[in-house]
Swiss-Prot record:
Pathway: Cell wall biogenesis; peptidoglycan biosynthesis. Mg(2+) 1 binds at D312, E324. ATP binds at residues 178-233. Mg(2+) 2 binds at E324, N326. Belongs to the D-alanine--D-alanine ligase family. It is an enzyme of class 6 (ligase). Its cofactor is Mg(2+); Mn(2+). This is D-alanine--D-alanine ligase. The lineage of its organism: Bacteria, Bacillati, Actinomycetota, Actinomycetes, Mycobacteriales. It catalyses: 2 D-alanine + ATP = D-alanyl-D-alanine + ADP + phosphate + H(+).
Length: 367
């Protein structure tokens, strides 16, 4: 019997967050303990093809502003069989079609955005009977869609910001909605992340272009009223015995950093231009920190999440407001989720090991 746990790290994918998924995977591959885990790296191209890759972390990093990616030339074409009788087998699609290239005890789907973080790969893994890290189908789908995240949180009595959803048939905001939301507003793809396709609108004549940009990524657009306040984050982690813990808080500061005036934490600020400062732990009063940790655990439960999540807040004069919940947060070297857990006394390799062990303990199927 293989003493090490066989982990298939799946990354890349078809969404606009393909490159960030690759960067997250590189960080995870670098930090999974080789004495405990036998790791296989599986990349998904932007077109949706699966390839067995070498999984070298140095090839999965942002270098001189250039984003990494998976191509058809990155490795051997393969697929994961959905037959539960062949549980976890990664099968060749090449000349030796059907040959088992590797097998996995657990899959770590480091996929951000649609076609990965939204319940799609989770459904495939459930069909295949393969345990996987992170949330199940329902929580992944709900957490990916900002509209339904807010609906579930609000139904649980949790504080969320005012917003309007534009479906594909809706061209713009009504006059009544504009008056209610006020300016500025943030225009976002409803099912997206990493601030891709997001605009800050400070005048209504900017709205059509912002909607058009968001719709390049998702026909459904969410328009959110600006919430003045500090940006705080909290990590939630499930342990193999099923209990949950909330991490030390982190804070993102953009306004006033390196001459920034807009306070908008966009894609370039997050990943390319070092335009934000991250404080871990966040400088907040103990009672505020405890309240936000409690809200994070409630939000995790409200969407029926499993495994892990990062819950994002605005801290206003009237108290915390939940912005969103990320069921597969970033795992890059600068990402807040592993940093918050490190500040909580859980180092990166231990964090990853806990997530894998929790996935194995949970298994698949109805639970």
């Amino acid at each position: 019997m293989n003493a090490r746990i066989r982990v298939a790290v799946v990354y890349g994918g078809r969404s606009s967050e393909h490159a960030i998924s690759c960067v997250s995977a590189g960080s995870i591959l670098r930090n999974l303990d080789p004495d405990r885990f036998e790791v296989t790296a599986v990349g998904i191209t932007p077109e949706g093809s699966w390839v067995l890759t070498e999984g070298r972390p140095e090839t999965l990093a942002i270098t001189d502003g250039k984003l990494p990616g998976v191509t058809g030339d990155s490795g051997t074409a393969l697929t994961l069989t959905a037959d539960p009788a062949r549980r976890g087998q990664l099968v060749s699609l090449g000349e030796a079609a059907g040959e088992v290239l590797a097998s996995a005890d657990v899959v770590f789907p480091v996929l951000h955005g649609p076609y990965g973080e939204d319940g799609t790969i989770q459904g495939l893994l459930e069909l295949a009977g393969v345990p996987y890290v992170g949330a199940g189908v329902l929580a992944s789908a709900a957490g990916m869609d900002k509209e339904f995240t807010k609906k579930l949180l609000a139904s649980a009595g949790l504080p969320v910001g005012d917003h309007v959803v534009l479906r594909a048939r809706d061209s713009t905001l009504s006059l009544q909605d504009r008056e209610r939301l006020g300016l500025p507003v943030f225009v976002k793809p409803s099912r997206g992340g990493s601030s891709i396709g997001v605009s800050r609108v400070t005048a209504w004549d900017e709205l059509p272009a912002a909607i058009e940009l968001a719709r390049r990524h998702d026909p459904k657009v969410i328009i959110e009223a600006a919430v003045p306040g500090r940006e705080l984050e909290c990590g939630v982690l499930e342990f193999p015995d099923g209990h949950l813990e909330a991490s030390t808080l982190g804070e993102i500061r953009v306004e006033g950093v390196r001459g920034r005036e807009d306070g908008f934490y966009d894609f370039e600020t997050k990943y390319l231009d070092d335009g934000a400062e991250l404080d871990v732990p966040a400088k907040v009063d103990d009672d505020v920190a405890e309240a936000i940790r409690a809200l994070s655990l409630r939000a995790f439960t409200a969407i029926d999440c499993q495994g892990l999540a990062r819950v994002d807040f605005f801290l206003t004069d009237d108290g915390p407001v939940i912005n969103e919940i990320n069921t597969m947060p970033g795992f890059t070297t600068i990402s807040m989720y592993p940093r918050m857990w490190a500040a909580s006394g859980v180092d990166y390799p231990t964090l990853l090991a806990t997530m894998v062990e929790t996935a194995l303990a949970r298994g698949t199927g109805l639970r």
